[in-house]
């Protein structure tokens, strides 16, 4: 009887875990618009962390940087290297855009693992990393699309659209389709990786003691950083491609 009761309780626990709903959201009604509240809240927190950290680090700049200033200068140099490698000698104006993308995604991804979002109760859904929501990743991908269209049109004018019939006009539909698949691949890659990582950690924490999921959480932090780098690198590569021509 005890064995049967234990089995029933175990199955009930597994059923409860399988019943975790994905896609429950908290909305704000502003006028006639429905605003995704939980994503805005977590995004504002991430932006506040970035602005606060940068302000503290550079509030008293030194000729020989130390501490936070040294760290931020290293990050800036890293972003410059990525931008220059992918875009070329005209990378300068695009460093702020690539840097903003990288830092926002990096801090957003890490916030999902390091910040205790779950302690804040919402009427519907729960707080999580901004990049855990498809709306955020699609918005970032669309911004990237606007950026590389702007870069190409600024550099080449209307001649930019000539790339769609190169090397042969037969490839026109494929070249047009490519511009739609770029933001799709960027958004779904980032969203899928971050969502999968958080779901795996939640399930492991529910099934096994706290210490066991720690290696998975550390791996998640590593892959979160890699995803931010991949997104920023691809964004820079698309901008560089639009400025140089069809490859």
Swiss-Prot record:
The keyword Thylakoid applies. Coiled coil: none annotated. The chain crosses the membrane at residues 38-58, 95-115, 134-154, 199-219, 220-240. It is found in: Plastid, Chloroplast thylakoid membrane. Its main location: plastid. The keyword Ion transport applies. GO terms for molecular function: proton-transporting ATP synthase activity, rotational mechanism. Belongs to the ATPase A chain family. NCBIfam families: ATP_synt_6_or_A (TIGR01131). F-type ATPases have 2 components, CF(1) - the catalytic core - and CF(0) - the membrane proton channel. CF(1) has five subunits: alpha(3), beta(3), gamma(1), delta(1), epsilon(1). CF(0) has four main subunits: a, b, b' and c. This is ATP synthase subunit a, chloroplastic.
């Amino acid at each position: 009887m005890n064995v049967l009761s234990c089995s029933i309780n175990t199955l009930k626990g597994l059923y409860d875990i399988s019943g975790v709903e994905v896609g429950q959201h908290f909305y704000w009604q502003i006028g006639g618009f429905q605003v995704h509240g939980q994503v805005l809240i977590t995004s504002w927190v991430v932006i506040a962390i970035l602005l606060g950290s940068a302000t503290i680090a550079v509030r008293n700049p030194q000729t020989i940087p130390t501490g936070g200033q040294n760290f931020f200068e290293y990050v800036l140099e890293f972003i410059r290297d990525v931008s220059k490698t992918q875009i070329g000698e005209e990378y300068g104006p695009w460093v702020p855009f690539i840097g903003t993308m990288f830092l926002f995604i990096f801090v957003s991804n890490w916030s999902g693992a390091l910040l205790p979002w779950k302690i804040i109760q919402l009427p519907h859904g729960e707080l999580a990393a901004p990049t855990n929501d498809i709306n955020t990743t699609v918005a970032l991908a669309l911004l990237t699309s606007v950026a590389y269209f702007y870069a190409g049109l600024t550099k080449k004018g209307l001649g930019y659209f000539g790339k769609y019939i190169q090397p042969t006009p037969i490839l026109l539909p494929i070249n047009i389709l490519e511009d739609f698949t770029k933001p799709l691949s960027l958004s779904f890659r980032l969203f899928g990786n971050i969502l999968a990582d958080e779901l795996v950690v939640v399930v492991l924490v529910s099934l096994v003691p706290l210490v066991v999921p720690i290696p998975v959480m550390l791996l998640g932090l590593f892959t979160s950083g890699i995803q931010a780098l991949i997104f920023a690198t691809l964004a820079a590569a698309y901008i560089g491609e639009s400025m140089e021509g069809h490859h």
